Amino acid sequence: MKKVRLTREGYEKLKKELEDLKRKFMYEISERIKEARELGDLSENSEYEAAKNEQGRVGSRIMEIEQILSNAEIIEDSEESDEVTLGKWVVIKNLDTGEEHKFRIVTPQEADFFAQKLSSDSPLGKSLLGRKVGDVVKVKAPSGVQRYQVIAVMNK
């Protein structure tokens, strides 16, 4: 598997999720399976089926996170510059509506729109990478082409 680029914050978040899932996997789900087995006939035991399904989902996620972390390359904060790169915060202005938005450009594994983390693989993320303060980018959206100007770029 190729290297997976993550910010330090994203790496730590995945480590915590892995710890939490392992704890859940080892204790909570195992206990639920044990309790469901004690109820008798497993062929018609919906609690047992639900616990086994959750065990499968959690186990898959644990393996996925372990693979990501074992292949992780941490993106360290770079020197202050006005160029948009992975891990940087960027303020953009929609030139059609005048609205300003602030995002952190992150890898797809870390993307979270509600936490203002924009995937570098998204149309907007791709168009912003390598741009500098003052640059204007055009992005195709369902509502048509949107124009954004880079207002600020910062590490934090």
Curated annotation (Swiss-Prot):
Task: Name residues in a coiled coil.
Answer: 1-32
Q: What does this protein do?
A: Necessary for efficient RNA polymerase transcription elongation past template-encoded arresting sites. The arresting sites in DNA have the property of trapping a certain fraction of elongating RNA polymerases that pass through, resulting in locked ternary complexes. Cleavage of the nascent transcript by cleavage factors such as GreA or GreB allows the resumption of elongation from the new 3'terminus. GreA releases sequences of 2 to 3 nucleotides.
Example GO biological process: regulation of DNA-templated transcription elongation
| Gene3D superfamilies xrefs | Transcription elongation factor, GreA/GreB, C-terminal domain, Transcription elongation factor, GreA/GreB, N-terminal domain
Any keyword Mitochondrion? no
Q: What are the entry keywords?
A: Coiled coil, DNA-binding, Transcription, Transcription regulation
Q: Which GO terms describe its molecular function?
A: DNA binding; RNA polymerase binding
Q: Does the keyword Transferase apply?
A: no
Q: Which family does it belong to?
A: Belongs to the GreA/GreB family.
The cross-references to PROSITE patterns, in alphabetical order and at most eight, read: GREAB_1, GREAB_2
Q: What name has this protein been given in UniProt?
A: Transcription elongation factor GreA
